[in-house]
Amino acid sequence: MTKTLPKDFIFGGATAAYQAEGATHTDGKGPVAWDKYLEDNYWYTAEPASDFYNRYPVDLKLSEEFGVNGIRISIAWSRIFPTGKGEVNPKGVEYYHNLFAECHKRHVEPFVTLHHFDTPEALHSDGDFLNRENIEHFVNYAEFCFKEFSEVNYWTTFNEIGPIGDGQYLVGKFPPGIQYDLAKVFQSHHNMMVSHARAVKLFKDSGYSGEIGVVHALPTKYPFDANNPDDVRAAELEDIIHNKFILDATYLGKYSDKTMEGVNHILEVNGGELDLREEDFVALDAAKDLNDFLGINYYMSDWMQAFDGETEIIHNGKGEKGSSKYQIKGVGRRKAPVDAPKTDWDWIIFPQGLYDQIMRVKADYPNYKKIYITENGLGYKDEFVDKTVYDDGRIDYVKKHLEVISDAISDGANVKGYFMWSLMDVFSWSNGYEKRYGLFYVDFETQERYPKKSAYWYKKVAETQVIE
């Protein structure tokens, strides 16, 4: 049976400042930790990325032509405050006003994120969100943006609090490149959630028009053997690290006893302790019912198996299938079902996981209001042929995920839109320029854009709301 989506559904495309803009030092932009980190550790930098800083009119014209009626954009904090605080950079402010005006001219609704992995270097080198002073700096930056950019109707505080803590302090593939420090992971999650809560409360108390929410990456976790209680426990603990801890903070305003039991177990085994203060929970509790929406970024699911060895994580950054490894002491190890389809980067393709995650939010956090799927897409080594890409694999991936969104809506979940990652090809944080996701192919040498086969398919779905 052919499935459909609601008439008012947003068919969006997603971007992020650092991954798309380029112009990393242009017009007074301050440095971010990634600038030097990429130079020192990787085979690529964020120059020129997709040159969105100069070419946004082209991308927004294409968006309008191809039925894309929403775009996720992030503001580069260091374009507004080059050192994260203090003096404002007027050229950065002007750039975003121009960008949002172009969005509205093209009838593409901007969903604007305040922080997408790019804390200004001056604050990042001072502890980033492990330093509680950063909570104040973020709230001040948020307040400036709420006041200044009144043309924005949809605000997101953070993109992917989970993967920030994970990338910075567990896997160690994000600056500062620390590995296996679970206490820092949870502390980073917690302090960022307090920052989110404070910003949301300020937004509502000040009476700004528009809506505000947060974007969480929520990879669904399953036991490798559902009949083995140890595997079930491994999946529960892994879910706490990546999903439940931040969801509890968002919608319960505290951490449930079950969540804290899991956190305490993980820290007992791995060492470290958390600094959770009474005023933090006052802030979390005050914001728990104020979120207008939840953004869910979903690409994959994981299967967890009981494991009692030492922690070892190997990140597959070059698309060499089968080269990744993930096992955490006292938690478990990832073990894919034998027949699970995977990308070249070892991400397990499992659309049902998105359905399960949406329904989990609906069941466990009934105060959620509404959901946007703020990122979903297929990273691929695209072959550019005849000025296009015949990306049938991407079409199939997106189609199957849109179908389960349709199912979730039929089953009572309030899902209002979908943003494909990514609108045009952008650079990938820990994989460079080879891993492409876009609807529009970018020739990074010339910065020309070419619609892929998926763009024509997506246009038809957006026009008809019929998934076929």
UniProtKB/Swiss-Prot annotation:
GO biological process, one term: lactose catabolic process via tagatose-6-phosphate
PROSITE patterns per the UniProt record, alphabetical: GLYCOSYL_HYDROL_F1_1, GLYCOSYL_HYDROL_F1_2
Pathway(s) where this gene product acts: Carbohydrate metabolism; lactose degradation; D-galactose 6-phosphate and beta-D-glucose from lactose 6-phosphate: step 1/1
Catalytic activity: a 6-phospho-beta-D-galactoside + H2O = D-galactose 6-phosphate + an alcohol
GO terms under cellular component: cytosol
Entry superkingdom: Bacteria
Gene3D superfamilies: Glycosidases (3.20.20.80)
Ribonucleoprotein recorded as keyword: no
Binding site for D-galactose 6-phosphate: 19, 116, 159-160, 297, 428-429, 435, 437
UniProt keywords, alphabetically: Glycosidase, Hydrolase
One MF annotation (Gene Ontology) recorded for this entry: 6-phospho-beta-galactosidase activity
EC number: 3.2.1.85
Enzyme class per UniProt: hydrolase
Active-site residues annotated for this sequence: 160 (proton donor), 375 (nucleophile)
Residue ranges the record marks as coiled coil: none
Family note: Belongs to the glycosyl hydrolase 1 family.
Protein name in UniProt: 6-phospho-beta-galactosidase
Gene giving rise to this polypeptide: lacG
